């Protein structure tokens, strides 16, 4: 009698060939989750102003230090009054984008109030994403992203919140991810430092501050791109999405004063 359990109840190998036992065995190595991001997007920056919120991100996907993919859109509109900006791993960003599309589809399916009383608010979308990020972190398989959710609530309040790969969340009148948290945020805080500064700031002033911060990031961040997208969510005019913008009016004269630049001697 053949005592091999893989042989019970099946013809002999001479009839149908040897049985592949690998499908019933564990892998030779333990399962390994993503250890570090591969193709990444850099900073997302945002700020509140008197009637809404403004958010911007460039369109570059970097393969390590290689500026590999152009035209990567990292601002994702969700509904009519929310934009989600994502930095970090591009493949994880695409997964989050699919989750958001499924969320919109599920909310709209057989729901005549999907564009009215039961429309997706920015706060709903943020709570969903914060839960997803914390759940993946708790499984020791995080989505390697930092996310900013910007929008205007149905009552007219500005909404701007941040969540990262650990599920850490916070809010501020100005928010930035990545290198922008070090380089852009101080510039934006010169315009809007506290909640009390928001009613004094017009959309023109806010947009000028964002564009200037994108220029500084292009100067200083080796993973940034000249091309960027900008979205304005206004409680009066709704969502305005500007694509294919470029950093303009650059002045590189300051480079000669940077130690280590070019052929100068230190």
From Swiss-Prot:
Its main location: cytoplasm. GO terms for biological process: proteasomal ubiquitin-independent protein catabolic process; proteasome assembly; proteasome-mediated ubiquitin-dependent protein catabolic process. It is found in: Cytoplasm; Nucleus. Keywords: Cytoplasm, Nucleus, Proteasome. Disulfide bonds: none annotated. Residues 1-33 form a propeptide. GO terms for cellular component: cytosol; nucleus; proteasome complex; proteasome core complex, beta-subunit complex; proteasome storage granule. Present with 16900 molecules/cell in log phase SD medium. Non-catalytic component of the proteasome which degrades poly-ubiquitinated proteins in the cytoplasm and in the nucleus. It is essential for the regulated turnover of proteins and for the removal of misfolded proteins. The proteasome is a multicatalytic proteinase complex that is characterized by its ability to cleave peptides with Arg, Phe, Tyr, Leu, and Glu adjacent to the leaving group at neutral or slightly basic pH. It has an ATP-dependent proteolytic activity. PRE3 and PRE4 are necessary for the peptidyl-glutamyl-peptide-hydrolyzing activity. PANTHER family: METALLOPROTEASE TLDD, PROTEASOME SUBUNIT BETA. This is Proteasome subunit beta type-7. The gene is PRE4.
């Amino acid at each position: 009698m053949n005592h091999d359990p893989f042989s019970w109840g099946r013809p002999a190998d001479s009839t149908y060939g040897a049985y592949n036992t690998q499908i019933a065995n564990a892998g030779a190595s333990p399962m390994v989750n993503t250890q570090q991001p591969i193709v990444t997007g850099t900073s997302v920056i945002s700020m509140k102003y008197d009637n809404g919120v403004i958010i911007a991100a460039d369109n570059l996907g970097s393969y390590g230090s290689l500026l590999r993919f152009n035209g990567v859109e990292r601002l994702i509109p969700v509904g009519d009054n929310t934009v989600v900006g994502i930095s970090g791993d591009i493949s994880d960003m695409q997964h989050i984008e699919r989750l958001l599309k499924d969320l919109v589809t599920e909310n709209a399916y057989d729901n005549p109030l999907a564009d009215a009383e039961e429309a997706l608010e920015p706060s709903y979308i943020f709570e969903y994403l914060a839960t997803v990020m914390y759940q993946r972190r708790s499984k020791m398989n995080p989505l390697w992203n930092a996310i900013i959710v910007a929008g205007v609530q149905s009552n007219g309040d500005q909404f701007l919140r941040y969540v990262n790969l650990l599920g850490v969340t916070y809010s501020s009148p100005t928010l930035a991810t990545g290198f922008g948290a070090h380089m852009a945020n101080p510039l934006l805080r010169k315009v809007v430092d506290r909640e009390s500064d928001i009613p004094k700031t017009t959309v023109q002033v806010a947009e000028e501050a964002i564009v200037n911060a994108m220029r500084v990031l292009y100067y200083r961040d080796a993973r940034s791109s000249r091309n960027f997208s900008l979205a304005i969510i206004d409680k009066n005019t709704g969502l305005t999405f500007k694509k294919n913008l470029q950093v303009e009016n650059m002045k590189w004269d300051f480079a000669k004063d940077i130690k280590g630049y070019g052929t100068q001697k230190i």
